[in-house]
Amino acid sequence: MVPGVDEDAYGTRKRLAFASALISAARPRNVLDFGCGTGLQLTMPLAARWPEVRFLGVDADATSIEFAKTHCTAPNLSFALAAPPREGERYDLIIASEVIEHLEAPGAFLRDLESRLEPGGRVLLTVPNGYGPFELASLAYDALRAAGIVPLARSIKRALFGAASARAPDTHAFSPHVNFFSLDELRRGIASAGMKVADFRPRTVLCGFGFDYLIRGRRLNAWNAALADRLPPQVAS
């Protein structure tokens, strides 16, 4: 486990533990975090835990990368706005966490990741369930926003939980989901890119608008993460 990151409704600590366990088993020399955002929730904690591994975080959002560079202290970690050239360095591990659901051409992106791997390299991919509770909560949020109710909901949240209840920003970009994958669709897309699924782990069940206010505290967050391991993967977020 990597210390310093609390669990939340999104399974942030569970994701970090999975990534750390993968690094422990695979012992990569270098890691590319494609779509790293601010780096706060994954790239930076991993680089701090594994100082012998070189990490590069890249993202298309300039504000997120500037934030990451400002807050980066690990000598084995760097950030860049543009992806490295395809003919450049190959990587033992590539992370693409919460990325392909935002892309117009996810298949091409997965093939690009595969082309950047060293022989025997691995990709760590995290993707929301396109038909799970999170996406349903997002639909409810969009409906409330269209009705002009979201500002009221935020005011109620601040009154109940305080301004400090927000999660640390994983990105400063606004990028809506344009893809909604089922697990079977995701497996087929991975296979079409010339890769295979070696391991799979659901993160949580209840997250997103509304659930963020209800699933709070260590016990509830731990229960939410454990629940995802006990239910069919189609139910997880």
List each model region and its residues:
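Short catalytic micro-motifs in class I SAM-dependent methyltransferases
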Residues: 98-102
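Conserved N-terminal segment of class I S-adenosyl-L-methionine
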Residues: 1-89, 93, 97, 107-110, ...
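S-adenosyl-L-methionine-dependent methyltransferase catalytic module, highlighting the catalytic core
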Residues: 2-13, 60, 71, 104-116, ...
